[in-house]
């Protein structure tokens, strides 16, 4: 049994961590922090956790957090980096759900996130926590940068095509739509029920900060000597609470030498406990992954032409955030990778 701490426990990813860790056979959550709610019992703020979590929120204290075996940061971007240098010296292992350590190019991160990085020397020590790619490095990592929600769905959808150099890396397109919880638990007019209900819109078309993260991940798996992957990424807002549906497009390099794409995807993910390649012709639905740590994928080649279409769905709060964070923790501590995550999706 290990002790876990959560920094930033009042957001949606924080409460999702609590929901999943409450039933984890190897983990005891010993501290959860919130400056705004310090002293308030967790179950009073989140009644779904009554009878499962008997903790009160506390002020962040590095000395207390340093007594944990692992600490999850479920904080806004820019917060974790300020505590990280001191906390890492305690020997505590860290899973950061924010974007602070995802992008290795610090000036690029600063450009997209609009702030100076508070711990640039630690960026190179972070392991990007996409288990389907970096499982071996995650095992020994002291600091894991948990991928974003859009990057998770997009990279898992594209990986088999990019790894095998089957498509033009300069002509990748991702149209991805997320539920409103992807914007976080904060008051925003654009996210009010009356604003998003019965509507559907794109946003961030000029540039979304998940773009450099996705491109970095795709470039990491490209064969040597191949032109760097370039992605056109257009996010959309869905009038649902949770879920991401990514529709991905890629252009084949040689239409005369194309392997069976269904078999390619099935073989690539055959041993991945949280990636489900659907039978040929089936379409994934966001509701099929709600509350679960699963990514469901379908692959198509319409009219047998030069375009490959991949459909990828995840729950943005689970496989896109807290579930994947726990998956990383399981790998780091040698637990069964599915421990605490063997959850059936909610229907209806």
From Swiss-Prot:
Its EC number is 1.2.1.38. GO terms for biological process: L-arginine biosynthetic process. Gene3D superfamilies: Dihydrodipicolinate Reductase, domain 2, NAD(P)-binding Rossmann-like Domain. It comes from the Bacteria. CDD domains: AGPR_1_C (cd23934), AGPR_1_N (cd17895). Catalyzes the NADPH-dependent reduction of N-acetyl-5-glutamyl phosphate to yield N-acetyl-L-glutamate 5-semialdehyde. This is N-acetyl-gamma-glutamyl-phosphate reductase. It comes from Cellvibrio japonicus (strain Ueda107) (Pseudomonas fluorescens subsp. cellulosa). The gene is argC.
């Amino acid at each position: 049994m290990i002790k876990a701490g959560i920094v930033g426990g009042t957001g949606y990813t924080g409460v999702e961590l609590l929901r999943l860790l409450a039933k984890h056979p190897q983990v005891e959550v010993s501290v959860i922090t919130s400056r705004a709610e310090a002293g308030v019992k967790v179950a009073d703020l989140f009644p779904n956790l009554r009878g499962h979590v008997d903790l009160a929120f506390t002020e962040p204290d590095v000395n207390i957090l340093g007594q944990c075996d692992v600490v999850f940061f479920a904080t806004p971007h820019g917060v974790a980096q300020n505590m990280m240098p001191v906390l890492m010296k305690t020997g505590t292992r860290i899973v950061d759900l924010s974007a602070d350590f995802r992008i290795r190019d610090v000036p690029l991160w600063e450009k997209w996130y609009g702030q100076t990085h508070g711990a640039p020397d630690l960026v190179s020590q972070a392991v990007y926590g996409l288990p389907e790619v970096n499982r071996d490095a995650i095992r020994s990592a002291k600091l894991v940068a948990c991928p974003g929600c859009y990057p998770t769905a997009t990279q898992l959808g594209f990986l088999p095509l990019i790894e095998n150099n089957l498509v033009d890396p300069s002509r990748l397109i991702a149209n991805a739509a997320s539920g409103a919880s992807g914007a976080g638990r904060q008051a925003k007019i654009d996210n009010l029920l009356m604003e998003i209900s019965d509507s559907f819109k794109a946003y961030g078309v000029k540039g979304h900060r998940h773009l450099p993260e996705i491109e970095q991940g795709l470039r990491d798996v490209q064969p040597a000597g191949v032109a760097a992957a370039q992605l056109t990424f257009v996010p959309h807002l869905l009038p649902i609470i949770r879920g991401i549906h990514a529709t991905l497009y890629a252009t084949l390099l040689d239409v005369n030498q194309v392997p069976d794409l269904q078999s390619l995807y099935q073989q690539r993910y055959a041993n991945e406990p949280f990636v489900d390649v659907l039978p040929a012709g089936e379409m994934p639905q966001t509701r099929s992954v709600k509350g679960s740590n699963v990514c469901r994928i379908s692959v198509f080649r319409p009219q047998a032409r030069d375009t490959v279409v991949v459909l990828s769905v995840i729950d943005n709060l689970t496989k896109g955030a807290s579930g994947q964070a726990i998956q990383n923790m399981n790998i780091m501590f040698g637990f069964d990778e599915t421990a605490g995550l063997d959850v059936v999706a909610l229907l209806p």
